[in-house]
Amino acid sequence: MWWSLIPLSCLLALTSAHDKPSSHPLSDDMINYINKQNTTWQAGRNFYNVDISYLKKLCGTVLGGPNLPERVGFSEDINLPESFDAREQWSNCPTIAQIRDQGSCGSCWAFGAVEAMSDRICIHTNGRVNVEVSAEDLLTCCGIQCGDGCNGGYPSGAWNFWTRKGLVSGGVYNSHIGCLPYTIPPCEHHVNGSRPPCTGEGDTPKCNKMCEAGYSTSYKEDKHYGYTSYSVSDSEKEIMAEIYKNGPVEGAFTVFSDFLTYKSGVYKHEAGDVMGGHAIRILGWGIENGVPYWLVANSWNVDWGDNGFFKILRGENHCGIESEIVAGIPRTQQYWGRF
């Protein structure tokens, strides 16, 4: 099934060379191989002593899943800049710069969604509402329309759930921020860290429609709703226009094992096997050394990649990065009475 969903650009990169290392994808051999290529990015060690089966489970997005209605294009009406970073454009919205950690769970589909929702609530209230939308609430309570929790899910289902049922607030693990903070602890899939070791993907926590002790607002009253949710066409300009006008979006792409070693530069697939589908948050774009890129936030903590972020080739639907864009607009009228 995966192969039918992998863009031609990735397949060509996968099959074009015969001298690629056949060793473990996290090995020094693989890292050295990538760094000896005349490519656009640098590899390094992000993971240490971690099973490949665990890493595959981190890629918990089902590509080619249910579709949301596609919004009407408007890029022709906008003069788009050569580069754009939502962190700078909306500096009064702290969630845009935040990197979360999905822990031992294939919940990337939920994280990409709630991160972008949090950003958009702040953006569309002109910085007046800063909230961390709860990944816990979405992961545990969305049910079958979103997929199978920690075993993988659909970004489109996440955004649809936001508009229909709403989501409460909730910060990262053990933060005691919001109604339902994340209950799956971060684990040490990186190098020389202090967190407990990753032992494999855990079960999806139970849906709990009650805020944690000490939070003053009820679960029902804490809900944040989307007004509308939609997909964005795979047009580079339309994706840029959507981010420029409304804020970061959720995207998904096919992950190959070389991506696990990304440290800096503009990622282009060079070597390795398919790991799975992975959802992320796209917050900007630019050009580095003549190579156009998307600026992306991952959910593997700040010690992965470039402080938790990465850049990936833009404009060629590389590894499907432009073909699974979803987003939505928050229901802002629910907030105006509070100001």
From Swiss-Prot:
CDD domains referenced in this protein's UniProt entry, alphabetically: Peptidase_C1A_CathepsinB
Protein family: Belongs to the peptidase C1 family.
GO biological process: autophagy; cellular response to mechanical stimulus; cellular response to thyroid hormone stimulus; collagen catabolic process; decidualization; epithelial cell differentiation; neuron apoptotic process; protein catabolic process
Organism: Rattus norvegicus (Rat)
E.C. number(s) listed in UniProt: 3.4.22.1
Disulfide topology: 93-122, 105-150, 141-207, 142-146, 179-211, 187-198
Pfam families, A to Z: Peptidase_C1, Propeptide_C1
Residues that carry a glycan: 192
Quaternary structure and interacting proteins, as annotated: Dimer of a heavy chain and a light chain cross-linked by a disulfide bond. Interacts with SRPX2. Directly interacts with SHKBP1.
Protein name: Cathepsin B
Task performed by this protein: Thiol protease which is believed to participate in intracellular degradation and turnover of proteins. Cleaves matrix extracellular phosphoglycoprotein MEPE. Involved in the solubilization of cross-linked TG/thyroglobulin in the thyroid follicle lumen. Has also been implicated in tumor invasion and metastasis.
